[in-house]
């Protein structure tokens, strides 16, 4: 018997993320009315803001129609428009709760939220039962290939169907689904990494391989130019749960040239805007890496609340990209400075110069390095670890609760230094010749440069308090520098 005038409330179940809602149904002499799904009220009670895009109705003409058990690659919000069902849900996601069962009855005064990967089944208990549900992805043949099934009659599940299954109407397909012991857990949504051949992209791939993470796809501009709108058509984005954007245009001086100006805006602003749009449309978490160049460097230490004030084209394009990504509901922006990773970089160059100065056969006897820009190094392996920490990975294949979405400053920890000071550390470790590094101002260093030069922030130190409050401890950049230099 349907209960009227209940308060809207939610009840957790023994399956993580599976939520039962009591709905408020208002009846009178004409019939009844209910708010079947109310985003603001229900998200306030704990319903994920799952972004439904399609509404389906299953009409069951006769009592005893039974359907399932199907785990589908989307979230569902299920209710009944008329009649009553007995529902059984089975967790078919990898993890400790795999195979866990929950059952209940639904009439128009109840609803249930079924997270992606939880198997769904029901039995109509009345003639003319209308079962209705919202989903947050459009059905496609590609999606159907990812379904996972379990047999309704599996004795291991031991579902106590009110009407014996041999008296029910089932499809031939549902009769022949595998038992739980033979069922394949539903794989999580995929993760795409863009810019995979850059310094950070290679560090992310190394982290994935080292930790045995599954479901990752790596693309660079030759396979997916994320700044080209037409190239988005090659992917079924409903299959992806996370995008990690490690791609960017980083030639800060060349960005001041006419051709560099166009390239920087394309890669650093248009590309992230396109990624943000597709991420918002498909409930994808977007990870994006920012730069200290979005600030003018007037403050000695910058935090996440500081307004943008870029000095040059590169910084302007990075700020524009940050603004676009910030409009994506599920986003992480990690702001870095002075990035060092696999490939050409400042430290590798200083090691080479130190070796030359130490070589009596080489005419080079000293080098000049800028001493009026202050900051901290960011090593790409540390940045990769921070990204996965925010996403909920804790050195295990299975993620835990991710951090709150938003912007996080992320560099190495420790005292700040100038480029000249860092160069001296490398020279001393390599050949004990740090005294051969001579300080100059930025203006002096670029005085004889013929091409365009991008303005640099004088202070690039970022406040690490916010990311440290998530439990992540950035590595001390000087210790990382010593370890890295020792490998060169």
Which residues are covered by each model-predicted region?
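NAD(P)H-binding glycine-rich loop region in Rossmannoid oxidoreductase-like domains
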Residues: 229-267
């Amino acid at each position: 018997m349907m209960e009227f005038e209940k308060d809207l409330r939610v009840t957790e179940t023994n399956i993580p993320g599976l939520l039962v809602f009591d709905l408020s149904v208002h009846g009178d002499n004409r019939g009844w009315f209910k708010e079947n799904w109310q985003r603001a009220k229900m998200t306030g009670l704990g319903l994920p803001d799952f972004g439904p895009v399609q509404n389906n109705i299953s009409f069951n003409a006769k009592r005893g129609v039974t359907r399932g058990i199907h785990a589908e690659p989307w979230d569902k919000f299920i209710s009944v428009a008329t009649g009553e069902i007995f529902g059984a849900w089975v967790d078919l996601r990898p993890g400790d709760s795999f195979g866990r069962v929950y059952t209940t009855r639904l009439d128009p005064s109840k609803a249930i939220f079924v997270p992606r990967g939880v198997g769904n089944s029901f039995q109509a208990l009345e003639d003319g039962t209308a079962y209705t549900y919202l989903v947050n992805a459009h059905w496609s043949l590609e999606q159907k290939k990812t379904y996972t099934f379990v047999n309704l009659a599996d004795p291991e599940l031991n579902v106590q169907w009110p009407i014996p299954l041999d008296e029910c109407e089932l499809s031939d397909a549902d009769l022949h689904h595998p038992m739980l012991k033979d069922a394949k857990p539903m794989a999580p949504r995929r993760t795409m990494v863009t810019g995979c051949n850059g310094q950070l992209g290679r560090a992310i791939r190394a982290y994935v391989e080292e930790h045995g993470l599954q479901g990752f796809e790596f693309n660079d501009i030759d396979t997916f130019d994320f700044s080209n709108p037409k190239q988005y058509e090659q992917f079924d984005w409903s299959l992806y749960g996370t995008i990690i954007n490690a791609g960017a245009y980083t030639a800060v001086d060349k960005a001041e040239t006419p051709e560099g100006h166009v390239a920087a805006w394309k890669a650093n602003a248009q590309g992230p805007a396109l990624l943000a749009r597709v991420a918002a449309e498909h409930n994808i978490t977007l990870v994006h890496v920012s730069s200290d160049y979005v600030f003018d460097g007037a403050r000695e230490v910058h935090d996440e609340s500081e307004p943008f004030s870029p000095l040059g084209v590169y910084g302007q394009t990075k700020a524009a990209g940050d603004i676009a990504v910030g409009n994506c509901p599920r986003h992480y922006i990690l702001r870095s400075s002075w990035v060092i990773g696999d490939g050409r970089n400042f430290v590798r160059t200083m090691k080479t110069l130190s070796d030359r100065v130490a070589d009596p056969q080489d005419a080079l006897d000293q080098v000049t390095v800028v001493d009026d820009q202050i900051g901290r190094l960011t090593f790409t392996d540390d940045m990769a670890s921070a990204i996965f920490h925010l996403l909920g990975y804790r050195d295990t294949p299975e993620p835990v609760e991710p951090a709150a979405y938003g912007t996080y400053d992320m560099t190495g920890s420790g005292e700040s230094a100038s480029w000249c000071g860092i160069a001296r550390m490398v020279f001393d470790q390599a050949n004990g010749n740090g005294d051969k590094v001579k300080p100059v101002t930025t203006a002096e260093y670029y005085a004889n440069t013929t091409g365009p030069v991008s303005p640099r922030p004088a202070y690039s130190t970022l406040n690490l308090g916010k990311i440290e409050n998530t439990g992540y401890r950035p590595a001390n950049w000087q210790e990382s520098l010593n370890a890295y230099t020792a490998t060169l």
